[in-house]
Structure formats: C-alpha cells, structure tokens
Swiss-Prot record:
Gene3D superfamilies named in the record: Ribosomal protein S7 domain
Record family assignment: Belongs to the universal ribosomal protein uS7 family.
GO cellular component: small ribosomal subunit
Record keywords: Ribonucleoprotein, Ribosomal protein, RNA-binding, rRNA-binding
Protein name: Small ribosomal subunit protein uS7
Length: 224
C-alpha cells in the first residue's frame, strides 16, 4: 500500500489485498470487543466477526460493526458518505419503519428483525447475519438505466450502479417484499421477512427482491 494512503487510514481500518496492487479498504471496524475480551454479539446472540462479504465492490460500504443494539442515533446523517458507517442491520431496521404509519417505531422494527433472525437460524441452521449479507449481495443490482436527452428527445441508456445505491436498492426491495407478503395475509411480517431473506440468499426465483433486480437488469440490457 502507498505509505501516504496508509497514514490517512484510521487504526481500525482493515485492508484486504485481492491481488498485487488491488486492495479493498474496509473502514468500518469489526474487531471491537467487550471489556472482558469477549466478542460483542448482535442482539446478544449472533457474531458478526466471521461474516464474509462475497462481493468486493460492496465490502467497503457494508458496515458490520459489532453492536448489541444497532442504533447510531443519526450521528452519520449529515456526513458525506455517512451511510457506509451505519451498520447494515440498522439500515434494514430503518427500512422497516416505512411507510409513514411506521415512522419512528424503531423498537417495533427491532423486534421484527430480531424475531426474523431467530426464524432464519431455525430454518437454515446458519448465522442469520451471514444469510442476510448473502441476500443483500445477491439482490444488489449491477446495471440500471438513466435518461439522456439529445435534441429534446430522451433516450434510455444503460449505466453501472454505484455501490451505495446497490445497497440502498437491495435493502429497500427486501423490506418491500416482506410488506407485500404480509399484507392481507395471516402470516406475520417476521415470518415473511425471514422467508424473503432466505429466498434471496438462495437465489430462489420466489424472492420478490430478486424479481425486482432481474427486471431492472433486463430493462438495462435492452438499452445498451
């Protein structure tokens, strides 16, 4: 690594070298421990230190900071690229507080996600944080369209999706899929959310989020 770049990084920054000259910088600390040296478990149950993010393009922007309760109190709200420092679990909870009738009900979103993670563990036997990360990686789109105007006429043009927007869309679609499943349905939203995450992690076509990703990439492919 360039010595000048190394001096600018914080002490908690993790750098992974995929190949000579190809490095991935993960600025969100993952080696935080309790005062007695034991790992900090999410919801008091799940260890995030062993979670693997398979997509190198998302690794720098997907924060897996060990926290008992993922709640940053909006401290990164007005910072440039502050979303990258918000734990991905908290961002999922924030999406569950939509639409407006659920605004501010973070404890409700916390209980929904906590119960959904318990269901995922019972159904798969795996760390639900790893299953959720795999689901986000699978759902994140790589290509979309934008409008370019030439001579007063708008043309759709295919463009690559930035990593921050990829995460935004993936989390939003997973939350939308859970809400759509539980609407006018006796199944609770916790079960619907768990099933949506499991289906997305397994690349199951039954996943609402995967269908949205495929639709976006299909439209983008026709606009190349």
């Amino acid at each position: 690594m360039n010595p000048t770049v190394a001096q600018q990084l914080s002490k908690t920054t993790r750098v992974e070298e995929l190949a000579p000259g190809i490095e991935i910088i993960e600025e969100c600390p993952r080696d935080i421990k309790a005062l007695d040296g034991s790992p900090i478990l999410l919801f008091g149950k799940w260890n995030v230190n062993d979670v693997v993010i398979r997509d190198p393009g998302l690794r720098r922007y997907m924060c897996l900071k060990p926290m008992l309760l993922p709640h940053t109190e909006g401290k990164y709200q007005n910072r440039k690229f502050g979303k990258a420092m918000i734990p991905i679990i908290e961002r999922m909870m924030n999406q569950l507080m939509k639409p407006g009738r659920n605004a501010g009900k973070k404890q409700k979103a916390y209980k929904i996600l906590k119960t959904a993670f318990d269901i995922i563990y019972v159904a798969t036997g795996k760390n639900p944080v790893q299953v959720f990360v795999d689901a986000v990686v699978n759902v994140a789109p790589r290509e979309e369209i934008t409008r370019v105007i030439y001579g007063g006429i708008a043309y759709p043009v295919s463009v690559d999706v930035g990593p921050t927007r990829r995460l935004d869309l993936a989390i939003r679609w997973i939350a939308e899929g859970a809400r759509a499943c539980s609407f006018n349905n006796p199944r609770p939203i916790e079960e619907c959310l768990a099933n949506e995450i499991i289906a997305a992690a397994n690349n199951d076509p039954a996943s609402y989020a995967l269908r949205r990703r495929d639709e976006m990439e299909r439209v983008a492919a026709t606009a190349r």
